[in-house]
């Protein structure tokens, strides 16, 4: 999940609970999310318009970037596709902040999707969730934290809210707040 905000400190964030934390953490009001676009296009069958929603999301991001607006967007980091976009935003003077909302296991992500489906949201097959989970963690530390101006990893598994795991600036780790969780992330990407 990836996001951008504030003209003087353009930002880029990442994962689950984004709706509640983004405005508060970043002062960011514009949140571009393909899932929400799909719900707007086809509320009863958002899966049927997923490709169109993804295209509209990318177009909206390009529009906001060319207008110099602050914004955030969501991604699982499962692909390399946003690396060039991050570099483009930085070239335009954006300060990119990555917020990664981590779940300790792919099974927890599968449970979250099942809950979302029970509440009327769209489904994602378990094998796709597992693949995106592994790729997202690997890309987090190999591709995205090294290029983001500021990054924070949060544990998003607790019922009482998110908890900071670590934070840094580009490829420099400034503080590991939760060494056990951070080690799980590092070890997972090696497996």
Language model features: what each stretch is:
Residues 24, 36-38, 78-79, 102-108, ...:
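Conserved nucleotide-binding/hydrolysis micro-motifs of P-loop NTPases
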Residues 142-191:
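NTP-dependent small-molecule kinase module
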Residues 3, 47-51, 75, 126-129:
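Flexible, glycine- and charge-enriched loops at secondary-structure boundaries
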Residues 31, 98, 151-153:
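Conserved beta-strand scaffold positions in the cores of enzyme catalytic domains, especially
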Residues 52-103, 136:
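Glycine-rich phosphate-binding loop used to anchor ATP phosphates in small-molecule kinases
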Residues 19-69:
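Conserved substrate/cofactor phosphate-moiety recognition/catalytic segment
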Residues 1-10, 14:
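Single conserved hydrophobic/aromatic residue that forms the stacking wall/gate
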Residues 94-140:
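A glycine- and Lys/Arg-enriched "phosphate-lid" helix/loop adjacent to the NTP-binding pocket
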């Amino acid at each position: 999940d990836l996001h951008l905000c504030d003209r003087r400190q353009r930002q880029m964030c990442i994962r689950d609970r984004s709706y509640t934390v983004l405005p508060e953490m970043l002062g960011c009001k514009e949140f571009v999310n393909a899932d929400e676009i799909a719900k707007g296009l086809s509320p009863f069958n958002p899966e049927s318009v997923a490709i169109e929603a993804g295209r509209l999301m990318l177009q909206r991001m390009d529009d906001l970037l060319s207008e110099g607006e602050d914004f955030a967007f969501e991604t699982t980091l499962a692909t390399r596709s946003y690396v060039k976009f991050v570099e483009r935003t930085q070239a335009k003077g954006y300060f990119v902040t990555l917020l990664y909302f981590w779940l300790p296991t792919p099974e927890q992500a599968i449970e979250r999707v099942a809950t979302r489906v029970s509440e009327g949201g769209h489904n994602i097959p378990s094998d796709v969730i597992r693949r995106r989970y592994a790729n997202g963690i690997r890309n987090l530390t190999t591709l995205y934290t090294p290029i983001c101006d500021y990054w924070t990893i949060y544990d998003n598994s607790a019922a009482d809210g998110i908890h900071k795991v670590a934070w840094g600036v580009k490829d420099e780790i400034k503080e590991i707040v939760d060494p056990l969780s951070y080690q799980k992330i590092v070890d997972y990407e090696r497996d």
